[in-house]
C-alpha cells in the first residue's frame, strides 16, 4: 500500500492483507473513521478503522490487525502481504494509526488489483 500526497509524493509504503479482488478496483473516498470498532460478530475488534467502501453487509476499510475476544491478534505483522481478511484491508497497528491520523474524511482511495 502507498500513501501518496496530493503532489504525488509517496510518504509511506507497506504490506497489507486483504481479500482477493475486494473491494473492486476503482476510486473511493474515506467516509467514516473510528478509533475502536468491532466486526459485529464473535467479539472481534479492530483499531484505527478508516472506511472507504461498502460491502454486501458491512463497510470496508483499513484497520489494524483484528483481535479476538481475548485480545489475541488474528494474524501477525509478519503475515501481512497475503489474502487474510473477510474484506477489509489489514495493516500493522503502527501503520493503521498513522493512516488514521493522516487521512481525513474525503481522502481519495484508489484500489488497484
Predicted regions, residues:
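Cell wall/extracellular polymer interaction/catalysis modules
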Residues: 1-34, 45-49
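Exported/periplasmic cell-wall-interacting domains
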Residues: 22-23, 34-113
Amino acid at each position: 500500500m502507498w500513501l501518496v500526497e496530493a503532489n504525488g509524493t509517496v510518504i509511506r509504503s507497506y504490506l497489507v492483507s486483504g481479500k482477493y479482488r475486494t473491494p473492486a478496483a476503482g476510486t473511493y473516498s474515506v467516509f467514516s473513521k473510528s478509533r475502536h470498532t468491532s466486526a459485529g460478530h464473535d467479539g472481534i475488534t479492530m483499531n484505527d478503522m478508516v472506511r472507504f467502501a461498502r460491502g454486501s453487509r458491512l463497510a470496508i476499510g483499513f484497520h489494524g490487525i483484528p483481535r479476538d475476544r481475548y485480545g489475541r491478534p488474528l494474524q501477525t505483522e509478519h503475515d501481512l502481504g497475503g489474502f487474510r481478511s473477510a474484506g477489509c484491508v489489514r495493516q500493522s497497528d503502527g501503520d493503521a494509526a498513522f493512516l488514521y491520523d493522516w487521512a481525513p474524511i474525503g481522502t481519495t482511495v484508489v484500489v488497484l488489483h
